[in-house]
Regions:
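Nucleic-acid endo/exonuclease domains
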Residues: 1-192
Length: 192
């Protein structure tokens, strides 16, 4: 039986967790890594210039330049250790003008676990605005950027992003092989 479904369906995110565990054996929820959150901490890495460019672009967007509040990257939605990758479950608030700005500044050769052009279009179509606090959109876009780009420095597969409303995730049954395979096919497509 499908639970009551809505745009902010908690059962959908729970089902994604169950499917990750069924597919990969284990997944961590709200997992934290000790990865720095400030662009200058990456100056001597392959991402240094890109992260400086993205943080600058976010600061220029609305003039909110002090949006990086945490010394470390906040927890990710899901972390699968084998093979190592992060999965983020993006609800509508992730598709903002700030996120579009960040995505537009990604290096052209970066490998992503989601369709970049589609995510950009979702940002244009949804145009979410969350001004509480005033720089919330910039913060969210920055931390999403770190979760997209930094894992590669640590040997991870690309971060997979699922749009919460692209599918009724709670309609899947994590106990059935058919739905496990259906979910796995989505992940494999994103990780190509």
């Amino acid at each position: 039986m499908i639970p009551e479904h809505s745009a902010h369906c908690h059962a959908c995110k729970d089902r994604v967790r169950e499917l990750l565990a069924a597919t990969y054996g284990h997944c961590h929820v709200n997992h934290s890594f000790s990865w720095p959150a400030r662009p200058e901490d990456y100056d001597h890495t392959a991402l240094g210039a890109a992260l400086r460019r993205i943080s600058g672009g976010l600061g220029d967007l609305r003039g909110h330049r002090d949006f990086i509040k945490s010394a470390l990257t906040p927890p990710c939605d899901f972390y699968v250790p084998h093979p190592p990758f992060i999965l983020e479950f993006d609800e509508c608030q992730h598709f903002s003008q700030a996120r579009l700005t960040a995505l537009s500044l990604y290096p052209s050769d970066v490998k992503l676990g989601f369709p970049l052009d589609r995510w950009r279009q979702l940002c244009r179509d949804i145009d979410a605005r969350d001004d509480e606090p005033i720089d919330r959109d910039e913060r969210r876009a920055w931390y999403d950027t770190l979760r997209d780009l930094v894992p590669a420095l640590h040997g991870f597969e690309p971060t997979v992003r699922l749009y919460a409303e692209e599918f009724v995730w709670c309609s899947l049954d994590s106990a059935t092989r058919r739905d496990q395979e259906r979910f796995r096919a989505i992940l494999i497509e994103r990780l190509k």
